[in-house]
Swiss-Prot record:
Statement: the UniProt record of this protein carries the keyword Amino-acid biosynthesis: no
GO biological process, one term: organic phosphonate catabolic process
The keyword Transferase belongs to this UniProt entry's keyword annotation: yes
Entry-annotated residues carrying N6-(pyridoxal phosphate)lysine: 194
InterPro entries reported in the protein's UniProt record: Aminotrans_V_dom (IPR000192), NH2EtPonate_pyrv_transaminase (IPR012703), PyrdxlP-dep_Trfase (IPR015424), PyrdxlP-dep_Trfase_major (IPR015421), PyrdxlP-dep_Trfase_small (IPR015422), SP_NH2Trfase/AEP_transaminase (IPR024169)
Family of this protein: Belongs to the class-V pyridoxal-phosphate-dependent aminotransferase family. PhnW subfamily.
Subunit structure as annotated in this protein's UniProt entry: Homodimer.
Pfam families membership: Aminotran_5
Stated name of the protein: 2-aminoethylphosphonate--pyruvate transaminase
Cofactor: pyridoxal 5'-phosphate
Species this protein is from: Paraburkholderia phymatum (strain DSM 17167 / CIP 108236 / LMG 21445 / STM815) (Burkholderia phymatum)
Catalytic activity: (2-aminoethyl)phosphonate + pyruvate = phosphonoacetaldehyde + L-alanine
Organism phylogeny: Bacteria, Pseudomonadati, Pseudomonadota, Betaproteobacteria, Burkholderiales
Amino acid sequence: MIPGNDPILLTPGPLTTSPATRHAMLRDWGSWDAAFNRMTQSVCTDLIEIVHGENEYVCVPLQGSGTFAVEAALGTLVPRDGRVLVPNNGAYCARIVKVLQRLGIAHVELPLREDAPVTAAAIEDAFNRDPRITHVAQVHLETSAGLLNPLDEIAAVCKHYGKSLIVDAMSSFGALPIDLRRGGIDALVSASGKCLEGVPGMGFVIVRRSALEACEGRSPSLALDLYDQFAYMQKTTQWRFTPPTHVLAALRTALDQFIAEGGQPARGARYARNCAALVDGMKALGFETFLTADVQAPVIVTFHAPRDPKWQFAEFYAAVREAGYVLYPGKLTQVETFRVGCIGSIGTNEMHDAVAAIGRTLIRLGIRVK
């Protein structure tokens, strides 16, 4: 447990935040105040620097969850006659398909197994089969299982074929290396409440300036128009509509801690240690991972559920919650699984303690794993 006896959130976001991040939300901010506007700009500057986009990219923050930002990116950046390829190996890829359907944007779905990352060859084949494809909407880290898709290879093939790549980096931004200097990526979407260890409530799109400047009047939405949001901020330094002031203040503090920790390499290394501690401990209890180690991202791990007839996830979840650890409820894979996150303001001590709590819960409920 963290100070105050709050539970540890072993989820991919919202997640356990530091006391300093929570404390940052105790101050009220005026949404048109110059100090708040400077804070917005400083946050955007840092977000761009994390992915090395200083020269060609701009950051557009947006009120709401990460999905709001994904929908804003698709609705703004894809023209009316565009056609989007969506490699689909999980629930968040499927959500992109649903967004495109609602927006009335033509798209091609590339179905994949839940445990199989997309390959550059598969995307190249899709381009050759359908030359009308103009864009690719790619989830970097498919959080439904913790599957890592090979972003650099995908970006390279998109660049080679002249296709625009929009990346959902919701659960990878800040934890895994992303370098926009390599080219091939037009837009990168993430949110405050994931690996940056802020709180939920703000998405953002880091987008190539030249791509965004060609999008005036394209979005079918007022609130989710990235071009208007950016143009208004450039003109006034303010948000178009009421900003999530406390969320932004928390993110500013979270970014300060991110930088002090050593940036993405250090954050990613801590999460990797957490993941290793979790996997080793769960395997010692008899659990098996859903993914192989070579495609497992150090953010959330999916485990096969025990075959013991006494296993009931709801009962298991409640018992682990009572012990002070909140797992991710429910499964998103087709087979019977459950997920445990390893990100947030936690370290290996918390992971070891969580595994011990899970072990005690299994004994208490009389569940055999092996």
